[in-house]
Amino acid sequence: MEAKVPRPRGRPRKRQRLEDDNRKLNNRGKKQVLEVEPAVPISLLGCYMLKDFDDNEVFLGKIVSYDTGLYRVIYEDGDCEELESGDLRRLIISDSYLDDELRVRRKKLDKLILKKEEKKKRNSPENKAVELPNQVNGVQARAVTNSEDGDSYSDSESSESGDKRGSDLEIEAPLVPPVDLPPSSGTIGIPEEAVAHLLSVYGFLRSFSFQLYICPFELNDFVGALYFSGPNSLLDAVHVALLRALKGHLERLSSSKSVLASKCLRCIDWSLLDVLTWPVYLVQYFTAMGHASGPQWNIFNKFVVEIEYYSLPIGMKLKILQILCDDIFDVADLRDEIDAREESEIGFDPDRVATGLLENVPRRVHPRFAKTSAYKEKEVTDSSTNESKDLDSRCTNGGSNEVSSDLDGNSDECRICGMDGTLLCCDGCPLAYHSRCIGVVKMYIPDGPWFCPECTINKKGPKIAHGTSLRGAVQFGMDPHGRLFLGTCNHLLVLNISVNGDAVVKYYNVNDISKVVLVLISASSHTLEYVEICKAITQYWDLPEGISLREGEIGLTQAKDREDGKVSEITKSDSANISNRSHTQTVFDLPTSTLGNTNSAVTGGSCGIQGKKLAARVTYLGLSFKPNTYNNHYTNGELAVSAAASLAVLSSEETHEPDLRKYNSAKKAASSNILEQMKAFSLVAPRFFWPSPDKKEITRERCGWCHSCRLTSASRRGCMLNAAVAGATKGAMKIFSGLFPLKNGEGVLSSIAAYILYLEESLRGLIAGPFLSESPRKQWRKQVEEASTCKALKAPLLELEENICSIALSCDWFKQMDDWLIEHSIFQSAPVTLGVPQRRGPGRTKQNTQAEVTAEGSDADSFTWWRGGKLSKVILLKAVLSQPATKKAAWQGGSKKIPGLNYGDASYIPRRSRRSFWKAAVESSKNISQLALQVRYLDMSLRWRELVRPDQNLQNVKGPETDVAIFRNARICDKKLSDNKVSYGVFFGNQKHLPSRVMKNIMEVEKTQDRNEKYWLQEAHVPLYLIKEFEESLHRVQMPSSTKKPSKKLSKLQRKQLKASLMDIFSYIASRRDKMEKCSCASCDHDVLLRDTTTCSSCHGFCHKDCTSMSQHTNGNVEVLVTCKRCYLSKTRVPTNINHRQSTAPQFTINVRHQNAVIPVIKVKPPSQQLSSQKPRENTSGVKQVTPDSSVSKSKQKTLSCGVIWRKKNVEDTGVDFRNQNILLAGRSDKPSLEPVCGICLLPYNPGLTYIHCTKCEKWFHTEAVKLKDSQIPEVVGFKCCKCRRIRSPDCPYMDPKLKEQKQIKRIVFTNQKQRQGNSGLDSDSERMSEQKDSKPSTPLPATPLYPPDDVFIPEDDPLLVSVSKVKQITPSSFDLEWSTTAFAPGPQKLPVRRQVKREDSDAAYPELHPIVKPEAEEQALPVLTEWDLSGELLFDYEDMEFEPQTYFSLTELLTADDSGGGQYQENGDMVVSGNPQFEPTEKEECEDDMGPCQRCLQMDPAPDLLCTVCGLLIHSHCSPWSALPGSSWSCGQCRIRALGSITLGSFGAITQFKSILPDRSTKVDISLAGPFAGAALSVSMFAVGLFLSTEPDAANDLVQVPSMLFQGSLLLGLISRATLGYAALHAATVSIHPLVIAGWCGLTTTAFNMLPVGCLDGGRAVQGAFGKNALVTFGLSTYVMLGLRVLGGPLALPWGLYVLICRNT
């Protein structure tokens, strides 16, 4: 870039147009503070600058005013000049660069400017009353004076006029102190000094959200993102959007031969900018542009070396965002948008001169331009301006649904991508969108009005646009003390912009604005200025008309008296307008006590102020912010824009081809259009993405404008754009699905670790070294998975790159590249880095202000500019080597050359390769963003396009035969290494003629034994995918599988597949010749090459790799399970039979009349059709058997059995409300507070999975657990889980493998027990009871069906609805209770269970069911009879059961008579007895008269009054031999004995019951022996210590006397005691021992009894675990005999008592 020639001093002001002057004169008497030019910068006012003139003199100047794009500068010699902002930006200096000399010169300059101001006041005193402070954001509205001639201006005239305009800025603070304003409202949770930057940046991002592709967000979330000290998606998306816009701007500048922009782009690859690497680009951009200069940016430089960007102070973050937003104002797209808005609202300016991009510089604006929702193109004329404003106001308010003169009032193109197609029209603004561009799921679109994201945020957040889309804030005026009053984002902002004042910022919400107005109007000085400010504030916020400015009028009168009545006409007219609006009672007339509460003082206002007050109650503290909930859906629109642009380029290339006859038919034209779209979409489809646990990269919606999306709704073709994106990421998605969750958390570090694992998995076959063996590979993967810091990931990444074969990397990875890096020394050049003159020392007179780096400078000269330092090393990694190379060179003392460096012959500067540079960059990475960038560099250097077989459908088939076609049947059959060069032997199959370009690369042709030719080629000339397949087959790592099978033995299914391939013998022989053996895939039944197959872990069949899913578990070891789709969808349920305790109570047969209801799942034929198809003799029950209709698909029946209710045809309810409330999609961020837990697998919430909610039990489940696919979600209208439906719950695929294995073991044990004890007639899987053909109906059923045939459905696997042909009919004769004669007989007893089944309607509502049995047929109501065996209850608790505990009714409830004749049901399913609605059956009710006779005397009168709560025995109190306590539960004598036996067991097994299923018998042995061994060790210790203390003389007083026979019962204890106490002591009558001896003896005795191999003692359990149950019986009998004999021959009767006590109930 050439140095700019400085402008001559004394440049005249721009000439004003006459119509502009007339417009300002006409508007002068009106609301002047609002009629100003668009917002312009304020940051340059009051700044100091140094400028070098042609006479080699450097003058210090000060910017004093601004007018019509020009800044007035006064120099220290008294001269002045008007410059543009582009010239000033490079000349401004900050306070940190002022030395003592410059400070003295600055003070003299300030005095000179002050003298000019005083002289101007004396010469023109009338201007003080006429000119009011009218600056907006530091912009002074042009005051029209009568002295202007309009033709030419001298230097002195321009200086004086400029001084008049800037007089209000440089006046020193008057003697009267400024008015003390109330404190800020405190509703924004950031420091006050940063509020201005916050509102400015937020308004800018909201105003240009479409141009920047930033999905709108609330101010509260923005504050939370700034405060969050870790990575968050909102802050990442904002920075990425801003930097991408700047990237395009730099590219345009580079194309215009801008040296600075070119070097900024060449220093770092901007194509790698993403949500993880953007901090590196931010540092590089700020350093290149000189933004991070000055001591206040030291913490920013520290971030580059040490800390993360997110930990910066919130003020620093906002300053960085402010600078980025300022620089984006020069982006071409943004300037076009601003011009279009200005043209549509203000009108086209024919005299406007377009400023070149090179001369545009960032403008800092306070506040920003605001956005308009209805974007108008440049063709909009002045006549349609009013209509556009009406549409704007309708969008902003979002209230009315009026439409314009168009048909629907909405645009015909998507607002984001600009394409037509299927659009979603907003009801709040005239915009339309593709659902994919804004990330809206169609199933969640309500039936009523729908509002776009912009309108939704406008309703929630503060208002950005105010009357015009070119102004984001309204300026109310500036007081004499330099405080500017602004209205923005529904807040009053007060900025101190005076040169000598402090940067004080205060803000007030709507509730506090009245306080500010009261304080200003009560000021004793400068009343005139404050009245104008208060008037503008009152008008802007629509304060109630009852609030007048009466006190302001009094202040005006006093001001007039002080100024001798010299008031301008404008002031008089304004005060007259104010007085006309006043009323008798105002807010200022209220007492002082009411001023403290402005909400109660300001009443009776308009609706506008009330609405704003409601909005003002919202605080923006960011307390509820969650870091990963925001999802920038507008990036989908950016992808669509790129796809449309690529398609346009391809279409233009096709139209320029001369052969136009190829489109002679519409079919060929459509085919060509489809091919063009496929090519265009494939070019822009991103291959790379950072994996995340919440799967935000998943896009479900269609684009709306491709060829497939434009077809009719009946077409089942998928979206072509989605297909291209899915094809580009298909391999990565398959691997990523099994990686999460990793052990290093859910942050960005886990994404980097997951991608490193993906690189290793994708390059299998092209990685050598330790990755070829399984054990080192496992250790490496474990190291990556457990890495918790950035430093921990460096070593695995470097190890991975070190072992990648060079053939898999591009050639640029090994090229020398330091030659162009040295050119980028601009970042270390002091003049260019700072962009302003450096600090000047004494005697230094000048320095060039615009130093440019010349491109023709030599490398040596460029290198001498480099200053070194940590900052430059981190940014550009100059002169940085990897640590191993540096240490080795240091040990050698510099005597040898460093390996990996190219020293060359002509240059003395060694050059590094890209690989060496990358290694040094990885080792010097200090934060996550730097490491992520290096991962992306490595990923970019891999030859991804050649790793997979290319798709020939998208290849350009024109011209000669492509390499893809040549190698389509080729395979590598051999490999050899000679002279460190690798060659491969390629077999081309049946291809006999090869092109010349292939033959010239052939090194040797070798004949094989089967007379085939093997062509030897170097590895560089062989396709990479062939090398990968060959190397992977040679060094295939056997992944551990759950099914261990001999490698040489084929399964039955594999043999069947291979046998089927032999049916066509000729094709098989040809395939064997070409090594192309095929077989049918076990999943999809299509052909698959045997070399490309993978084996399913379940069915052991050959399958496509795409037909399988891989799941990895890292519980200590890497465990990979490969499951084909067929096995995953058709997993057979393990039969589970619920065995319960065997009932010993008398059997009661209870005839219960109830309503039969069915669940609408499977259609039922009308009875008339079934009667004709069935024989009368087979249908003995008189009820039609239910058969599923064939029209219902099998897949749908399987899904229906899990409780999903589908949408029916011709039903108005679409289920939108149910899906909005009860289905939580993966990555959905509109419900951040909802984190459900799956009710089956009990795993914590995973944002990457979809959940569905049961409306009955309020539990959530994974959609995969209920067999619900994502494509079927739009058809769901309801859901009720399996437990609520009383069916067996399926297994969740995300269940912990250990928990899943335990459940399977329980089911197997459950099934085995049921089979041993005998089936009671009800199978829990088939859910059908044994047929009872002897039951005949007494009354036939009605001929007409009770339900319409289309509305009656019955699930196949509902256990509550058994086959009616197999239900025992209860006739009226057996209505009363009957006492079974086999009450205490062994075996399973029958007990009927009463259940009610609710009907599921399509609208997911449950109205009150009506009886389906007519009154005359009530007695034929069939109860459901089931049998319950309770013998296995000790092994299971209710949590292990397949049904809920409510299924097990108490005997009191079951014995309660039900004479209601069929109760009705509420909506929640609870039964209400029709006879007495207030009756609620409980377990504490007393027995009624009709419960049954006494089981002792068999008498019904009087009624039995005692009921055993355990066994259900019903007797009279006078017949009972057992006593009964009043008010307590009663149990019979046998149950009391059982309870007594279980209580007296004590520690013998009672407190060591197994609460869960043991995995194997060895575990049972270990557990059984652990307790006795521990007790024996403790007892022996106590016994030994006690014996030792017994011999001590000091412990004589603690000894006790015991009989000596105590030690004669055990040989071991007797010998130990004899050795310790002596022979004489043990032969005496009594022995003196310590009490610890007795305690140890008792413990050993107890342990010995506990080890007896009988019953449930630990010894019995150990024997059972070691030898089995039959061995325990043998050991038990032998123990009983031996104990009996021991009791007869010895004095101890304790063993026999223990035997009676323990073994009696086993």
From Swiss-Prot:
Record SMART domains: DDT, PHD
Keywords: Chloroplast, Membrane, Metal-binding, Nucleus, Plastid, Plastid outer membrane, Repeat, Transcription, Transcription regulation, Transmembrane, Transmembrane helix, Zinc, Zinc-finger
Bridged cysteine pairs (disulfide): none
Zinc fingers typed PHD-type, residue spans: 411-458
Phenotype upon loss of function: No visible phenotype under normal growth conditions.
Compartments, as annotated in UniProt: Plastid, Chloroplast outer membrane; Nucleus
PROSITE patterns: DDT, ZF_PHD_1, ZF_PHD_2
Membrane topology term: Multi-pass membrane protein
Record's function text: Membrane-bound transcription factor required for the plastid-to-nucleus retrograde signaling. Functions in multiple retrograde pathways. The plastid-to-nucleus signal plays an important role in the coordinated expression of both nuclear- and chloroplast-localized genes that encode photosynthesis-related proteins. In the nucleus, activates ABI4 transcription in a PHD-dependent manner associated with histone modifications.
Record's protein name: DDT domain-containing protein PTM
Naturally occurring in which organism (per UniProt): Arabidopsis thaliana (Mouse-ear cress)
Lineage: Eukaryota, Viridiplantae, Streptophyta, Embryophyta, Tracheophyta
